[in-house]
C-alpha cells in the first residue's frame, strides 16, 4: 500500500496528480502534492518528477502528452518537451492498438493540426505513420498548390476541418490526414519540369489500408 502523496508522485502529469479530500468541510478541498493547481492555472503540461522516468515507466505517456496539449490547449513545459524528443523511440514498445487510440483522440480534437505537427516535430510520428515525413519537402505544382509541399497542404486541410461548424468524424479526419500520402512515392517530373503524381490515389488507398 502507498499513501496519497506517493500515489500522486507516481502519476504522469501534474494536472493528473490532484486529489479531492472526501472529509473536508466544506467539501471539495483539493489536495495537491505536485503543483498541479498552479500548472493548470498557467495552462502548462508538466511531468511529475523526472520526465525521463515517467516516460520509461509507461511510454504511451509520450502520446498522451501530445493529446493533452491539444485537447486541453496547454503548453508543454520545457523539460517535459525535451524528454519527449529524447524518448520518442520508446514508443516502439507500445502496441499499435494503444497508439491508435491516442491518435484517434488527437484527430478528433479541434487542435488536430497542432497535434500532427507535434507528433512530427518530436519524432513520435516515426512510430505512428512514418510515411508522413515523406510529405515534407514533396513539392507540388505551384499553380495548383501555392501553399507549398504535400505536408503543408495536409496541415491546412486538417486545420480547415470543422471550421464551418460541421461535425468531424474520425473517418473524415483520417481521410484528410492520409488523402495525399500516396503522392511522394508517385511523384515524377517530366522533361518540361511539370510535376505529376500519376496513380497517387490508388497508391494512397493501398498505403492507408496497411
What would you call each of these model-derived segments?
Residues 1-210:
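Catalytic cores of the polymerase beta-like nucleotidyltransferase superfamily
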Amino acid at each position: 500500500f502507498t499513501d496519497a502523496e506517493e500515489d500522486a508522485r507516481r502519476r504522469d502529469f501534474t494536472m493528473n496528480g490532484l486529489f479531492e479530500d472526501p472529509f473536508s468541510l466544506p467539501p471539495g478541498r483539493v489536495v495537491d502534492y505536485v503543483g498541479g493547481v498552479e500548472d493548470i492555472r498557467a495552462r502548462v503540461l508538466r511531468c511529475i518528477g523526472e520526465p525521463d522516468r515517467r516516460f520509461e515507466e509507461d511510454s504511451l505517456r509520450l502520446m498522451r502528452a501530445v493529446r493533452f496539449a491539444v485537447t486541453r490547449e496547454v503548453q508543454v513545459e520545457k523539460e517535459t518537451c525535451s524528454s519527449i524528443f529524447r524518448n520518442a523511440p520508446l514508443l516502439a514498445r507500445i502496441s499499435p492498438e494503444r497508439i491508435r487510440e491516442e491518435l484517434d483522440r488527437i484527430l478528433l480534437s479541434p487542435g488536430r493540426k497542432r497535434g500532427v505537427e507535434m507528433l512530427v516535430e518530436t519524432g513520435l510520428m516515426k512510430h505512428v505513420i512514418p510515411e508522413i515525413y515523406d510529405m515534407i519537402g514533396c513539392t507540388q505544382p505551384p499553380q495548383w498548390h501555392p501553399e507549398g509541399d504535400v505536408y503543408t497542404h495536409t496541415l491546412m486541410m486538417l486545420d480547415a476541418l470543422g471550421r464551418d461548424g460541421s461535425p468531424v468524424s474520425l473517418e473524415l479526419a483520417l481521410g484528410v490526414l492520409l488523402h495525399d500520402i500516396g503522392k511522394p512515392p508517385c511523384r515524377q517530373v517530366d522533361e518540361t519540369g511539370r510535376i505529376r503524381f500519376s496513380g497517387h490515389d490508388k497508391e494512397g488507398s493501398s498505403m492507408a489500408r496497411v
